[in-house]
């Protein structure tokens, strides 16, 4: 009896991404390199404006343009249907997606199951120390305050570095783990640990 092979995530293969926008549209893209994901994240900034009377308003500056630029780099079917900036953003969101399916504590480790494009993958990371989490938080964001606004930028590189420190094992990949998957796994562990740490002392 022939065994069914479990799909694995392969960043080297092409991805056909369908979206719904006035009907179904499809395009073929390659998965961005870590360097492209780094640049994409660094280019984004969120500005929080303070309008008075305690009414802040947040704005993601140039995000449609940033998504469209990455989409143009990774699209491989150049003769396919035209995608506007909003549709390009939908495609980037689809290939970036890491949906966490499960988190299990195993002693001092966490086993994270995730659904990623075309596969289900698993990461086992050890529990970070308080200092590792503190250093990661400081390095992951840049906050610049002005008179009536605050600008925030986020960086992926610190999540990659922390993932490599915490890494015990991973499964479901044909090659290296992409930075966006590392970042999602690290965020999930930190978030889960924060929930566990909220228990009142006895």
Regions found by a protein language model. Name each.
Residues 2-5, 12, 21, 25, ...:
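Short, surface-exposed, charged amphipathic helix/loop patches that serve as local interaction elements
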Residues 17-18:
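The feature marks the first
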């Amino acid at each position: 009896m022939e065994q069914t092979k479990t799909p694995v995530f392969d960043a080297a293969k092409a991805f056909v991404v369908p979206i719904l926008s006035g009907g179904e549209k499809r395009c073929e893209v390659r998965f961005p390199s870590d360097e492209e994901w780094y640049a994409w994240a660094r280019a984004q900034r969120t500005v929080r404006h303070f309008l008075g009377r305690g009414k802040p308003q947040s704005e993601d500056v140039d995000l449609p343009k940033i998504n469209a630029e990455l989409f143009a780099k990774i699209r491989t079917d150049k003769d396919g249907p035209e995608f506007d900036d909003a549709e390009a953003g939908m495609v980037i969101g689809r290939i970036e997606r890491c949906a966490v399916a499960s988190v299990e504590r195993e002693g001092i480790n966490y086993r994270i199951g995730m659904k990623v494009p075309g596969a289900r993958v698993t990461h086992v990371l050890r529990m970070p120390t308080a200092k590792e989490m503190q250093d990661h938080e400081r390095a992951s964001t840049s906050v610049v305050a002005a008179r009536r606004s605050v600008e925030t930028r986020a960086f992926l590189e610190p999540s990659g570095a922390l993932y490599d420190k915490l890494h015990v094992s991973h499964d479901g990949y044909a090659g290296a783990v992409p930075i966006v998957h590392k970042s999602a796994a690290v965020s999930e562990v930190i978030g889960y640990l924060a929930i566990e740490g909220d228990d009142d002392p006895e």
